[in-house]
Regions:
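Boundary/linker segments of alpha-helical solenoid repeat arrays
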Residues: 85-86, 270-274, 304-311
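Active-site-proximal structural scaffolding
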Residues: 19, 49, 70, 99-106, ...
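Hydrophobic alpha-helix feature that most strongly marks membrane-spanning transmembrane helices
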Residues: 82, 118, 142, 194, ...
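Well-ordered alpha-helical scaffold segments within catalytic/enzyme domains
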Residues: 55-66, 106-122, 181-199, 243-253, ...
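Solvent-exposed loop and edge beta-strand segments that line ligand/cofactor-binding
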Residues: 37-50, 91-103, 164-181, 224-242, ...
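Active-site acid/base region of carbohydrate-active enzymes
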Residues: 2-25, 31, 38-87, 116-178, ...
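Non-catalytic C-terminal accessory modules of carbohydrate-active enzymes
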Residues: 207, 214, 291-394
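Alpha-helical repeat scaffolds
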Residues: 255-264, 294-297
C-alpha cells in the first residue's frame, strides 16, 4: 500500500507532451516510495534515508498540501540521534548506520519545511537537535576553518569517479564538498536561529561560515579552468563541488555564469547522476542560466527511452528501478520553469521568476498553505508575451 497523497498540481506545455510524461513517472515513483514513512525504494532497503528524503519532502510540498510525511521524516531524524551528536543515516531502522553527510541534509530539510510550510512552533523545538549536529561537525574544524576528514560514510552521489559514493578527499580532509555542505547548512541554521531561536547561535554559525569561506578560494579555485577543484591538491574536479560553490554564493555574478557553463561543458568532470542533479539544476537557476534547464534533462530522457515507468537509482548498471530521489523534475518544473518559489518562511512571500527556455506556452498550479498558485505564460514568435498569475488571498 502507499501513503494516500493527493496530487494537487496541474501542468501543461502544448507540443511538449514529454514533460507531462516525466511528471507522471516522477509522481508514480514518489508514491511507490512512501507508505508509513518515505522510503529510498520499494523493493530493496525500503528505508527512509535522510539524503533521499530531503528531495522527497520537497516533492511533497510542491505537489500536495498534506504536511504529514514531511514533518514525520523530520521528526524521525530527531528520534534517530545518538549520543555522539549526529543522526543515523536512515530511520526507523534496527541497524545503526551513519552517513555523516545525511545529518546535514536533514537540517536542510528542516529549513525547507520552514520556508515552504512555516510551522515555527514545531521548528523551534528542533533547534537544539540541529545545534548538536553542527557542534559535532565543529569538532572536525582545523585551525584554517576547513574540515578535517569527516568520519563515517560521507556519501554524496553514486558518481563514476567517487569511491563508493564518497567525494575525493585528502587524508587531512581538504575536501571542497565537505566544506561547502557545512557552509550551506550553517547558513540555513543561522537563518532559523535568527528568526525563531537564539540570535547568539546565529552569530556563531555565521562566524564559522564566514571563516570557512575564506579558505575555499585559496584552497580549491583553479583560475585556468574557471572551476573549483575537489581537493587542495587539485587532483579531481566534479560537477558536485561547482554546483555547491554556486548555491552557497562562493562564486557569484559573471564568474558564476562561467563556472556553470564550464561545469556543463567539461565532460572530464565527475558527473552528477540523477540524485545530485537536484543540486546541479538549482545551481543552474541560481547562476542565471535557468533557461538551459530543459536542455539538461537527458538523464531522465535516457530512462524513458529504456521504457522505465519509474526513475532508477542511477544510470545503468542500476540496481533499483524505482528510487524517489530521481523525481526532482516534479519540483523543478514548477520552481524553475514556472518560477514559483517561496521568498519567506511559511511561503508568506512568493517569488515569481520563470525560466521558460524554448517553451512558448506553459502553465501550472501548485498548492500553497493559503490555497494555490497558478502561473500561465504565452510567448509569440518575437519572444514577447503575457503572464497571468493567480495568487492565494492573504
Amino acid at each position: 500500500s502507499a501513503y494516500p497523497f493527493r496530487n494537487e498540481t496541474t501542468f501543461s506545455a502544448p507540443g511538449h507532451e514529454e514533460l507531462g510524461r516525466m511528471l507522471e513517472i516522477g509522481w508514480r515513483t514518489a508514491r511507490l516510495c512512501a507508505n508509513e514513512t518515505y522510503m529510498d525504494c520499494p523493493y530493496y532497503e525500503q528505508l527512509q534515508y535522510f539524503g533521499d528524503t530531503r528531495i522527497q519532502a520537497m516533492i511533497s510540498m510542491y505537489n500536495t498540501s498534506d504536511p504529514y510525511m514531511v514533518k514525520n521524516a523530520i521528526e524521525q531524524g530527531r528520534q534517530s540521534m545518538v549520543a555522539e551528536g549526529i543522526t543515523m543515516s536512515r530511520y526507523p531502522s534496527s541497524v545503526h548506520q551513519f552517513i555523516s553527510s545525511f545529518s546535514l541534509w536533514w537540517i536542510c530539510m528542516g529549513h525547507d519545511y520552514w520556508m515552504y510550510r512555516g510551522d515555527e512552533a514545531y521548528m523551534k523545538t528542533l533547534l537544539p537537535a540541529y545545534r548538536q549536529v553542527l557542534s559535532w561537525y565543529e569538532q572536525w574544524l582545523k585551525p584554517d576553518y576547513s574540515l578535517s576528514y569527516v568520519p563515517h560514510w560521507f556519501f554524496v552521489d553514486w558518481a563514476a569517479g567517487f569511491d563508493y559514493g564518497e567525494p575525493i578527499r585528502e587524508k587531512e580532509g581538504n575536501s571542497a564538498l565537505q566544506d561547502l555542505m557545512y557552509i550551506m547548512t550553517l547558513e540555513f541554521a543561522a537563518e532559523m536561529e535568527q528568526a525563531i531561536g537564539l540570535p547568539t547561535m546565529a552569530d556563531h554559525y555565521r562566524k564559522i561560515a564566514t571563516e570557512m569561506r575564506k579558505t575555499i578560494r585559496p584552497k580549491y579555485w583553479d583560475a585556468d579552468r574557471n572551476l573549483f577543484a575537489d581537493t587542495q591538491d587539485h587532483r579531481g574536479y566534479s560537477q558536485h563541488v561547482n554546483a555547491l560553490a554556486i548555491l552557497t554564493g562562493v562564486t557569484k555574478g559573471e564568474e558564476a555564469v562561467k563556472v556553470m557553463n564550464q561545469t556543463l561543458a567539461d565532460t572530464s568532470l565527475i558527473q552528477c547522476t540523477i540524485y545530485f542533479r537536484y543540486y546541479l539544476n538549482q545551481a543552474l537557476k541560481a547562476s542565471g542560466l535557468g533557461d538551459q534547464f530543459l536542455d539538461n534533462l537527458q538523464i531522465w530522457r535516457d530512462q524513458m527511452a529504456l521504457g522505465l515507468t519509474t526513475w532508477a537509482e542511477m544510470p545503468e548498471p542500476s540496481r533499483s528501478d524505482c528510487h524517489a530521489w530521481g523525481a526532482s523534475p516534479n519540483i523543478e518544473f514548477y520552481r524553475i520553469l514556472l518560477g514559483i518559489d517561496s521568498d519567506a518562511p511559511g511561503f508568506r512571500k512568493i517569488r515569481i521568476a520563470p525560466s521558460l527556455g524554448k517553451l512558448k506556452e506553459v502553465s501550472g498550479t501548485i498548492p500553497h498553505p493559503l490555497g494555490s498558485v497558478t502561473a500561465v505564460y504565452k510567448l509569440d514568435e518575437r519572444g514577447e508575451g503575457t503572464a497571468r498569475l493567480v495568487l492565494p488571498e492573504g
